[in-house]
Amino acid sequence: MVVPKVGINGFGRIGRIVFRNAIEHEGVDIVAVNDPFIEVHYAAYMLKYDSTHGRFNGTVEFDGNTLIVNGKKIKFYAERDPAQIPWSETGAEYVVESTGVFTKQEKASLHLKGGAKKVIISAPSSDSPMFVMGVNNDQYTKDITVLSNASCTTNCLAPLAKVINDKFGIVEGLMTTVHSYTATQKVVDGPSNKDWRGGRTAAQNIIPSSTGAAKAVGKVIPSLNGKLTGMSMRVPTSNVSVVDLTARLEKAATYDEIKQAVKEASEGPLKGVLGYTEDDVVSSDLNGDPHSSIFDAKAGIALNSNFVKLVSWYDNEWGYSRRVIDLIAYIAQVDAQ
């Protein structure tokens, strides 16, 4: 098995959780990190302690411009310009672009100048191909140099939508994600010119917001293009979100038949990506769950045999970051063939 050497640009929430997942995963080798806004000793502290996911399970130290994690040395750079990051020094061929800034092809491809061969954007991209593991990763070809792992919400919705669409057909659907607050929101009311509601206190409000996650499913499942759209409700929880998909089906189905289809997929072709539970779970029970999507069999309802509401949980940090690593491991195997 090929173990790709990986660099991470941007050591924020996703960058650090991708790092933690990579250490657990063992299918990739993190060799370098770049972040111009934090120094190496602070990066070590932020990796070691996490309010949501707890202490790092291992040792974290630093020496000069090097992070030392479980005894392994990882080069730490502080370049603002992606083109200036010397990825080739460490042999990092696959770069996770997790700054949230360089989401377009032109900017993300600057990493190639420093020696990277592939760039994986950990956010939706308007002009780069998007891949969702378990849904359309088989469409990846070696000639693609910049790709997107889509969003955490698309990663939750797409596997569920795929199962339902393949088995029963989706005529149309509306999605609401009840989404934990994120770093872009405010601790207290503050200015937010583009999104006035988004400037209100995150921990005190339910905040309606927009999301392109449902429409993006149409990019990874072309047969659903134009059939899905959705919105978001930002709520006062720090992590774990839940998708509510209301869909009209082509083929009549009982709710039990839908449950069975999802359960079979979760144990078969989508194992590890799509989870299934009949337990009475609440959001904190899914903290640290590595699935993209965990179908809640008890939470959904059917109005009739063609109109259903389906509910699926996701750890919007941990599950998404695990898929970033899975995607890199997958494309590295394809590239090696």
Curated annotation (Swiss-Prot):
Q: What is this protein called?
A: Glyceraldehyde-3-phosphate dehydrogenase
> According to its record, what are the GO cellular component terms?
cytosol
Q: Which SMART domains match?
A: Gp_dh_N
Binding locations of D-glyceraldehyde 3-phosphate: S151, C152, T153, T182, T211, G212, R234
GO annotation terms (biological process) = glucose metabolic process; glycolytic process
In Gene Ontology terms, what is one molecular function of this protein? glyceraldehyde-3-phosphate dehydrogenase (NAD+) (phosphorylating) activity
Chemical reaction(s) catalysed: D-glyceraldehyde 3-phosphate + phosphate + NAD(+) = (2R)-3-phospho-glyceroyl phosphate + NADH + H(+)
Specify the species.
Monascus purpureus (Red mold)
Instruction: Quote the PANTHER family the UniProt record gives.
Output: GLYCERALDEHYDE 3-PHOSPHATE DEHYDROGENASE (PTHR10836), GLYCERALDEHYDE-3-PHOSPHATE DEHYDROGENASE-RELATED (PTHR10836:SF76)
Q: Where does NAD(+) bind?
A: R13, I14, D35, R80, N316
Q: Which SUPFAM superfamilies match?
A: Glyceraldehyde-3-phosphate dehydrogenase-like, C-terminal domain, NAD(P)-binding Rossmann-fold domains
Give its E.C. classification number: 1.2.1.12
Q: In which pathway does it act?
A: Carbohydrate degradation; glycolysis; pyruvate from D-glyceraldehyde 3-phosphate: step 1/5
Q: Does the keyword Oxidoreductase apply?
A: yes
Where it sits in the cell: the answer is: Cytoplasm
What UniProt keywords apply to this chain's record, in alphabetical order?
Cytoplasm, Glycolysis, NAD, Oxidoreductase
Q: Where is this site: Activates thiol group during catalysis?
A: H179
Binding partners and assembly: Homotetramer.
